[in-house]
Amino acid sequence: MLGLVGRVVAASASGALRGLSPSAPLPQAQLLLRAAPAALQPARDYAAQASPSPKAGATTGRIVAVIGAVVDVQFDEGLPPILNALEVQGRETRLVLEVAQHLGESTVRTIAMDGTEGLVRGQKVLDSGAPIRIPVGPETLGRIMNVIGEPIDERGPIKTKQFAAIHAEAPEFVEMSVEQEILVTGIKVVDLLAPYAKGGKIGLFGGAGVGKTVLIMELINNVAKAHGGYSVFAGVGERTREGNDLYHEMIESGVINLKDATSKVALVYGQMNEPPGARARVALTGLTVAEYFRDQEGQDVLLFIDNIFRFTQAGSEVSALLGRIPSAVGYQPTLATDMGTMQERITTTKKGSITSVQAIYVPADDLTDPAPATTFAHLDATTVLSRAIAELGIYPAVDPLDSTSRIMDPNIVGSEHYDVARGVQKILQDYKSLQDIIAILGMDELSEEDKLTVSRARKIQRFLSQPFQVAEVFTGHLGKLVPLKETIKGFQQILAGEYDHLPEQAFYMVGPIEEAVAKADKLAEEHS
């Protein structure tokens, strides 16, 4: 049906074009071609077909041109709609093509989801009759798959009967939940100073070696333990080595369990060496896995995208290959649309939520670059990891003054939480201002009030550190998950001066404030 309608629209549009002069603008007709299939997409059906392979009797075409990752396919009848998946026949490995443009009445221009080496003109191509479909459901947990849903972890097929198309509409307004609610992570510095909203989008900024991966793994672990929720990790344009390391670290820390079905995370990888088509779609594959857990199981899902910049970069490559006129700094003209289409699907509905943590690479540290600038428009919170804090041995190395959150508002988090958070930031800012004086003149030159500020700030700084459960293997410290009430109470008491008599090392790498008191008593015993 879709193929037939797509055919009619294509024929009528191209008929209309014949009447135009050679210089007449084409975008309106091209827009019509692009919009028709999307408008006719049916509601998502997870068990619509037992396998994503093309159906018998599907429309067959043949390859007429191969230009790198772009493949032109000619169909004698039944032109496939935009975004349909086509499958090349007569190959050992599965090669999926996605329809990107209609060229005239019988030819489509497609983007390959894998290498096009060995393709020849005349090869047969089958229309699957639907967009790329991938396996979804609990069976994907603990597994790694690629953009088209094939397992790449050498552990056999993913045994699920449920498949879903990677392209879908964002939830309707009536389905969305408007309640603003904190997603408690159990990480003190995050929950207190830059809390995550359920269904929010968080930007994670950090260089190499400051603890991005460990923070991501702890979030996956804590969400599973505190909320019973699942996580999905989408590696977009990842280094293969880093993806491999992450997988093995997850096995070591128990986030992935190879022996039974208790794994808490599904992994989707589209590495740096993949063609641009795969890198531009792998984030949607990860999002589709997460949407199943939200919509069918009512879960609060965590979706990690590393790195969201690579999604934009791949889109830019695809756009250039399709011959579109580039926009600012050479990016695709549809940059905001591509980003918005994906980001709008990450939201809270009345059934569940998808909270997304997106690692963001900033090209040449230029925040005005169109790629990061477009991403910022969608973020609800930013978590900035600082090398200076990591050098002090304070982990997680989250910068308490640079990290922000849209829900840090007394009407959402409550006035007590808000006042404590602002009090903590004020005392840390005062300490930062005094550091130059301390470096030049020393602590003795400070007034008594300033000495007290410095003392409390150093205790707060250390109390913002926390032993992680996933890092127990490396640190030897027992990991701690701290409830929000305990976090607020602890910082409130430090600000009030209730623990001015305790040494600052008692606050380092502990969970709730009671542990700091117990550690201080233990230190006193050792010194006596």
UniProtKB/Swiss-Prot annotation:
One BP annotation, GO: proton motive force-driven mitochondrial ATP synthesis
Phosphothreonine modifications at: 312
Gene Ontology molecular-function annotations: ATP binding; ATP hydrolysis activity; proton-transporting ATP synthase activity, rotational mechanism
Keywords, comma-separated and alphabetical: Acetylation, ATP synthesis, ATP-binding, CF(1), Glycoprotein, Hydrogen ion transport, Ion transport, Magnesium, Membrane, Metal-binding, Mitochondrion, Mitochondrion inner membrane, Nucleotide-binding, Phosphoprotein, Transit peptide, Translocase, Transport
Record-annotated disulphide pairs: none
Residues with N6-succinyllysine modification: 124, 161, 259, 264, 522
Functional note: Catalytic subunit beta, of the mitochondrial membrane ATP synthase complex (F(1)F(0) ATP synthase or Complex V) that produces ATP from ADP in the presence of a proton gradient across the membrane which is generated by electron transport complexes of the respiratory chain. ATP synthase complex consist of a soluble F(1) head domain - the catalytic core - and a membrane F(1) domain - the membrane proton channel. These two domains are linked by a central stalk rotating inside the F(1) region and a stationary peripheral stalk.
Record NCBIfam families: atpD
Name of this protein: ATP synthase F(1) complex catalytic subunit beta, mitochondrial
The species this protein was found in: Bos taurus
Lineage: Eukaryota, Metazoa, Chordata, Craniata, Vertebrata
